[in-house]
């Protein structure tokens, strides 16, 4: 299954909800959400500063993860950025592929 790193920043409304609900309840909600989509929550960390949470998940595919991202964004409670994570073995496979690329202007 593809693995993703999601960086999240709560809006004011989302932060109010987090204060009311608590961190462990939020993690449990994300865990249940991922299971319902056929995925898995691997890690969930809160932070302070520009970003409020770092979440590592496995999802069944990019389409399902995009649907999740759209739904979360539409809630208005949190802003997210999701990064597809690759294993070292996947990079080895990518390095062996021939890609014909012409830089702009060449």
Regions found by a protein language model. Give the residues of each.
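A compositional/biophysical signature of low hydrophobicity enriched in polar/charged and small residues
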Residues: 1-106
């Amino acid at each position: 299954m593809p693995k993703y790193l999601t960086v999240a920043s709560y809006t004011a409304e989302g932060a109010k909800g987090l204060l009311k609900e608590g961190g462990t309840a939020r993690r449990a909600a994300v865990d249940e959400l991922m299971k319902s989509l056929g995925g898995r929550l691997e890690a969930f960390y809160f932070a302070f500063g520009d970003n409020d949470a770092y979440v590592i998940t496995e999802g069944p595919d990019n389409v399902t993860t995009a649907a999740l991202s759209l739904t979360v964004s539409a809630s208005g409670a949190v802003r997210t950025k999701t990064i597809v994570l690759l294993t070292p073995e996947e990079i080895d496979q990518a390095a062996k592929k021939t890609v014909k690329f012409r830089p702009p202007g060449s």
